[in-house]
């Protein structure tokens, strides 16, 4: 897709694009995207998240690795919407993360806004910059590399 189409995707549409399901689906809505360029998505963080039972019971904080996973899932949606190939039988897998920084804790009740920008794409590899914000403040950032793989090759 080379057009500059912009759209909003709800949870039903996201379920059709990502293989993740509860409790590991970490994108609730896509606010905006431009194929081949960028995406803005949202994860609404609630006290009902299963990870808050142990991280940490008295001071619940969203684990940083799950913030990275939420960014990766948003990036996966961007990849799917940026290609003409079917997602049927494919998985989007992390191959690396660089310059990972956690700037602000994420708590129950926060709305995590996920921004991913495509840096480059070559063959099956996609490199993106991801930034997660809460109330306009940077909570986490990273450069992420992922590969699109066929399920039967795994």
UniProtKB/Swiss-Prot annotation:
CDD domains: FabZ. GO terms for biological process: fatty acid biosynthetic process; lipid A biosynthetic process. Involved in unsaturated fatty acids biosynthesis. Catalyzes the dehydration of short chain beta-hydroxyacyl-ACPs and long chain saturated and unsaturated beta-hydroxyacyl-ACPs. The active site is at 55. SUPFAM superfamilies: Thioesterase/thiol ester dehydrase-isomerase. This is 3-hydroxyacyl-[acyl-carrier-protein] dehydratase FabZ. Belongs to the thioester dehydratase family. FabZ subfamily. Its main location: cytoplasm. Signal peptide: none annotated. The keyword Lipid biosynthesis applies. Keywords: Cytoplasm, Lipid A biosynthesis, Lipid biosynthesis, Lipid metabolism, Lyase. Its EC number is 4.2.1.59. Gene3D superfamilies: Hotdog Thioesterase (3.10.129.10). It is found in: Cytoplasm. InterPro entries: FabA_FabZ (IPR013114), FabZ (IPR010084), HotDog_dom_sf (IPR029069). It catalyses: a (3R)-hydroxyacyl-[ACP] = a (2E)-enoyl-[ACP] + H2O. One of its GO terms (cellular component) is cytoplasm. GO terms for molecular function: (3R)-hydroxyacyl-[acyl-carrier-protein] dehydratase activity. The gene is fabZ.
